[in-house]
Amino acid sequence: MSSMNPEYDYLFKLLLIGDSGVGKSCLLLRFADDTYTESYISTIGVDFKIRTIELDGKTIKLQIWDTAGQERFRTITSSYYRGAHGIIVVYDVTDQGSFNNVKQWLQEIDRYASENVNKLLVGNKCDLTTKKVVDYTTAKEFADSLGIPFLETSAKNATNVEQSFMTMAAEIKKRMGPGATAGGAEKSNVKIQSTPVKQSGGGCC
């Protein structure tokens, strides 16, 4: 085997975006490490994890970037939209405001990401059924009107977390077609480590 061949057939760069506290980091932890913590600390700037999956007999390396949802980091994260193959917009099903802000996040995607980037809408914390305020049908109809897939997830119970990332990978692979080369993602020398900062308030479910 030639040493030029990478260990994967595709490399997809994915972004997790959405308001602070909706559970983006918990979704990433569940998918990449299969762990969950009630008292997760706020992501500062950008952090990423890598997981390799198998899909239709192909090996796909997912580089998943977890971006801070705080307003003050909007300018930092704008550069991370570039080169992304897929973007997962996350809201909290117990927080109407986070769902209302999805439109704003979609505007960010239109402004900064490549035109044909794949999108996925995720309503997290679906295990909190008694606190749920965003109806599944409402969110599904909204996603359908935009032509993007929608799933409700629970990072706590691992509900649909795997499915969300696999759906995104399958959509990107379908769009790129059989002629796509391994890699695809832009090479970047920027390395930003997230620094733990204690966050007052509840966990991220």
From Swiss-Prot:
The lineage of its organism: Eukaryota, Metazoa, Chordata, Craniata, Vertebrata. PANTHER family: RAS-RELATED PROTEIN RAB (PTHR47977). Mg(2+) binds at residues 25, 43, 66. Disulfide bonds: none annotated. A motif (Switch 1) lies at residues 34-48. NCBIfam families: small_GTP. This is Ras-related protein Rab-1A. The keyword Endoplasmic reticulum applies. The modification N-acetylserine is found at residue 2. Residues 178-205 are annotated as: Disordered. May interact with YIPF5. Interacts with C9orf72; the interaction mediates recruitment of RAB1A to the ATG1/ULK1 kinase complex. Interacts with GDI1; this promotes dissociation from membranes. A motif (Switch 2) lies at residues 66-83.
